[in-house]
């Protein structure tokens, strides 16, 4: 039973040393109700069942007297609450002995055990000489170690008594305490013991000195008693010390080596409260409590939020920290991505920062912070629109698109790709919407525009990194905190192929960084440009093809096979921004893999990107770029023949050229292309645009024929194959004739050889021979390309030889005198001409006597 009068306790609390320090030792457990009985009995408690039999608010008023008598004769504070409070006081005494270097230290101590939601804890308030701000925080380890030492000593004294057998609950509690004590002995006690702290102006936390008397009065005393989770506070708190307005609870309290009486606790609080916390204004308000009767009720959440807001204080930054925060803010607003940008645009702040200790290292850290902040906020396409805004306005209602000299359209048309389709795919890839196909490869020989296009895209984005495959240990050293990755002249080796597959597929992976820990690399779009076979992995002197299939599933390949002229020019970031922004605007409803397949009528996007399919009347020739670009196929719209002028005459209002009577007279064979229908073009004529006979080509003006021949000679086999379906008379061959008609034409040519040379023969249409790989794809590897060129050269030689033999036959048939030279008969001077007799079979109806009339003589 607790002892001591009220006056003694008032004097003990008032005599508390100043300054004082408040410590908390925590014994955490996730399930308190499962272990509290074993912990109670392990510490010597013997009345667990009696605690649950104490009467409470059950209406049995006649039992109140028996409850008070029971509390007088037995204190329910025995067991773990009692053991923890006394262990706290003994630990405080041992700590002050070491600080004052005496066996009987002079100090004041209040030790109080309490039960919380996640376990038990002990408040220890210590005041006295030897404990200062410098060593108060360090003393936590001494106090915690001593506390568990005395707690375990108390338990061992009870368990080592004769005839003591531990129950299962007690064994569980003992194992739990042993684990906590072992952590303390190892020094791992950061979440076990703590001291009340405050934050200084520079942001550091230091031990906070308190007034022990006021702290005990305001915080430690106004609490009801609770020793177990399953027992109400009303059961274990005496009537004179119980207050229903107190929401806090305690278990047991010790002050200066004596037990604080639970019967005089409320009286002690009243006396100390009137001395240290009472205010004249409070007395005035307490005299008229009805003033607060009509106030609205405020929820506990609102009160907690207000308290948290009141406790929050603005963090005071140092001068260096303010400069760093200003640099990050300005660099983020101005999109400054490199150290050079910071020096040029924030020279004053960088000068101040470099003048401080460690300024260069701080600048690198600031750049990393800026990159992390931008990458977390934008993707590559969104950031490109901010870094390199579009400078060209687009009119979707126009019949055609005005590219205004954008070299991207010239390059992609030359290489056989639709600029709108390629731009649609790149916008999706930069927006991270292409799934596993997270990378695009520009493949082909040198000087075909691969690097030109990849470099312009990366510079338009701005925040890009490069892959250095020469450094085989850290190839992706520059990849973290970037929006797009550029791999120039990509080569795959066994050293980094596995990491490369993760990066190319957009998988989150950690990559090694030189002189630093590994960094996480989230999904980042990758652009590759190479003239090597990136699907063949090289390891030492061996090559492996097992990685080809996984790599092709991650890479979308575009083949650039036509070399560019030296005067092609450089693609600028502004061209890329205009092109991609217009592509995104046109296809804004199809920016997904499903939308891409529906828009371009493809089953799926494989490793080989689809080639361009031109609309009728549209060309890949940059000469026609001034007429605009088709909204659908991306080709250049050709001019109409009516707009062409002859060098010898001026155009008339009807579209015929003055001075060319043949063209103006025959209007049935006129072919014209209109620029309406959103730039798709249409063929309009009064008669079929394809002539019915080969000789009808003579009606087309000679200037048009020359231009057609030049265009046919310039076009490659692949270009003509892709244009074979177009219904234009200057590209297609004449319609095949019937055998009878063809024989009559040949007979007419034999009879009148001079007529065959009066007009220019129709140009032959280049054809793609059977077996050539131009079936919608292009040569992939360098070996395929060499085989293709050798087959082309062999077939060209065969056609030339065949064409030479045909010409010789024509010459021989047109000049009969060549027969004599072929037979070796040469006319010599002074000799008579040699007469050759040629005999022919006579019809059966002729008479034999007239056979000599059928002989023909030819003089050589």
UniProtKB/Swiss-Prot annotation:
Multifunctional protein which displays endonuclease and helicase activities required for initiating and directing viral DNA replication. Also plays a role in viral packaging and transactivation of several promoters. Binds site-specifically to 2-3 approximate tandem copies within the origins of replication (Ori), unwinds this hairpin region and nicks one DNA strand thereby initiating the rolling circle replication (RCR). Becomes covalently attached to the 5' end of the nick and provides a 3'OH for priming DNA synthesis. The endonuclease active site can probably bind other divalent cations. ATP binds at residues 444-451. Residues 418-573 form the SF3 helicase domain. The active site is at 219 (for nuclease activity). This is Initiator protein NS1. Keywords: ATP-binding, Covalent protein-DNA linkage, DNA replication, DNA-binding, Endonuclease, Helicase, Host nucleus, Hydrolase, Magnesium, Metal-binding, Multifunctional enzyme, Nuclease, Nucleotide-binding, Transcription, Transcription regulation, Viral DNA replication. Transmembrane segments: none annotated.
